[in-house]
Amino acid sequence: MPKERLTEELLERLLASSTPEAYLDEGLTIDRRLPDYLFQLLGEKGMKRSEVVRASGLNSTFVYDVFNGDSRLGRDKAIMLALGMGCTLRETQRLLRLDGVSELWAKNRRDAVIIWCVEHGYSRTQTDDELYRLGEKTLLGTGPLR
C-alpha cells in the first residue's frame, strides 16, 4: 500500500491549484471507509478482533458490527476502540474522522487528558483512571462530573 500523504500537504496542493478540477485530476483524494481502516490497523498491529474487544472494553457484537460496517461507534467508543488497538494519536484522529465525529482537541480539558494518555501508550482502563483522577467523565460514562 502506498504511503498516504499528510492532510496538510494535500491542503497546500489544493490551495495552489488553479481550479478544483486541477487538484481532483491529480487523484490525491481517497474514499476510505472506517471498516477498511480498522482492518488495516489490525493487520499492522498484528491483532485479532477478540483482542481489541478485550482491550477496549466494548461489547463484542457491537465491535464486530463496526468492523462489518453495520454500526457506527460514536466519539467515546471510537476513542475506546483506538485505545484498545494501541493507536497512535495520528491513527486515533483518523479513526475519529472516518467515524464522522470530532477529533480530539487539545483546548478541551477532557480531550487534553485523552491526548496525553494516547501519546503515552495508556490502555483504556488507565485512561479512564486518569480521567477520573482529574475529575473528568470517563470513557465508560462514569466518574465525577463537574
What is each PLM-predicted segment?
Residues 70-83:
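Short, basic-rich loop-to-helix N-cap that marks the start of a DNA-contacting helix
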Residues 2-5, 11, 93-122, 141-143:
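Short, charged recognition helix plus adjacent turn
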Residues 42, 53, 82:
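The alpha-helix within a helix-turn-helix
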Residues 57-73, 98-100:
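Recognition helix of helix-turn-helix/homeodomain-like DNA-binding domains
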Residues 83-85, 110-138:
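Long, compositionally biased
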Residues 48-55:
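Short alpha-helical "recognition helix" segments of helix-turn-helix
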Residues 50, 61, 90:
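Key DNA-contact positions within bacterial/archaeal DNA-binding proteins
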Residues 16-48, 125-144:
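A short, Lys/Arg-rich alpha-helix, primarily the initiator
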